[in-house]
Amino acid sequence: MVEFVNDPNFKDLVVDTTIDNRNDEEPMTIRNFTELMIQFYKLGWMRGSGGAMGCISGSELMISPSALQKERIREQDVFVYNMKDKTEVQRPPNKRITVSSCSVLFSLIMKETGSECVIHTHSKCANLITQLIKSNVFEISHQEYIKGIYDPFSGKALKYSDTLTIPIIDNMPSESQLLEPIRGVLENYPQAIAVLVRNHGLFVWGPTWESTKIMTECIDYLLELSIEMLKNNIPLVNEEAFEKEDNLSDKMRTLMFGDMAPV
């Protein structure tokens, strides 16, 4: 595996380091990072050493290690990179531990979307929903937890009546091979804040670590709810949402990234 510091997307990643922690109520620290990883393990998102997280805090980028049991992660196990000079400033004492294979996916997503946090989970419902839905998108509308999802076009939260759309891509033998499919998602679904990987899991990204955590929790709830709705033949998208989508489709296509609120 090529050293992450040589990853072209990491090298091109530019962050405004004059803005500290943006709107986070609590700054991201290595201690908070490890505590979140343990919490995600307990939620069933990162079992068997799977799952990962990358987060920018000030001038530093923190990324979880690969093949390490997340419930036993320590502060010294986190990889830390300097965003200004693009150097590695911390790595685990155990030289056999490598940075997450998702690192190149995180840098791509951060570079293309301006996000400062990406969470990758292996939750059971994220896997199952991709097997129940045969299309290349997951959609759901008229659910309260949709209001917990950030809209990068407006800079505000989605409304209850909005349709949440999450693209679905096929799994690959290794996570690094998901680079081009995820690039395609970012190009074709610029409003997306997440992507599902069939038979695998979920990636969620956002402007802060707190908003990304909240969105991941909301999406996981909506995926679990959707599985039960499908079991009971309840449509995931309300008919009213289909009508609204037709009316908004032309408008959404005209929106440019320059019109977006800061991410």
From Swiss-Prot:
Keywords: Amino-acid biosynthesis, Cytoplasm, Lyase, Metal-binding, Methionine biosynthesis, Zinc. It holds the Pfam family Aldolase_II. It is found in: Cytoplasm. One of its GO terms (cellular component) is cytoplasm. Its cofactor is Zn(2+). It comes from Caenorhabditis elegans. Transmembrane segments: none annotated. One of its GO terms (molecular function) is methylthioribulose 1-phosphate dehydratase activity. Substrate binds at residue 102. This is Probable methylthioribulose-1-phosphate dehydratase. Binds 1 zinc ion per subunit. Zn(2+) binds at residues 120, 122, 200. Coiled coil: none annotated. It comes from the Eukaryota. Belongs to the aldolase class II family. MtnB subfamily. It catalyses: 5-(methylsulfanyl)-D-ribulose 1-phosphate = 5-methylsulfanyl-2,3-dioxopentyl phosphate + H2O. Its EC number is 4.2.1.109.
